[in-house]
């Protein structure tokens, strides 16, 4: 009985459909997953002539830590807000979670601007004022380089030309490619 059911045309059709579906999902995972990984590598890895966004985030973490050291004796509330936002980015940074880094970076930008305003309003001595200027310059420079990174255009191009087009958009969701 078992041998006869495998020879039945409907059984053969179902097996063929399942095999094709499985092959399509595996191909999508491999091809799109490979391209997504390549783009993510551009976020994490510096290339000749351009440092990665990941390394620029490290600069922002360093600059925000420096600002925190100035601010902690001047405005505890602003220092705490900066510390919380910095910790969130540091956690995302250490886990290498790009989406979480994006969100935490936006929050750190707000907290840094607020902390900068609080530090500028405080009466700083000459060395603190010089350090503040250096931290702000480093932070803003890193932010500008992140905005101008070629990674951003490569993500946009990939999303427009591949990921958001049918059938890749449907298959990626189905295959679990993020």
Locate predicted features:
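A helix-centric hydrophobic-segment signal that preferentially recognizes long
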Residues: 2-178
């Amino acid at each position: 009985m078992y041998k006869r059911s495998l020879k039945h045309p409907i059984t053969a059709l179902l097996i063929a459909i399942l095999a094709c579906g499985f092959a399509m999902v595996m191909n999508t995972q491999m091809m799109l997953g490979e391209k997504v990984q390549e783009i993510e590598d551009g976020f994490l890895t510096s290339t000749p002539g351009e440092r990665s966004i990941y390394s620029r985030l490290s600069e922002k973490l360093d600059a925000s830590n420096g600002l925190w050291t100035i601010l902690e004796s001047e405005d505890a509330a602003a220092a705490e807000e900066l510390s919380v936002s910095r910790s969130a980015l540091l956690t995302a940074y250490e886990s290498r979670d790009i989406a979480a880094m994006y969100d935490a970076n936006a929050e750190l930008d707000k907290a840094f601007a607020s902390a900068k305003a609080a530090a500028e309003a405080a009466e700083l001595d000459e060395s603190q004022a010089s350090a503040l200027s250096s931290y702000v310059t480093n932070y803003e420079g890193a932010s500008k380089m992140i905005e101008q990174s070629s990674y951003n255009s490569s993500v946009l191009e990939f999303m427009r030309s591949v990921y958001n087009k049918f059938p890749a958009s449907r298959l990626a969701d189905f295959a679990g490619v993020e």
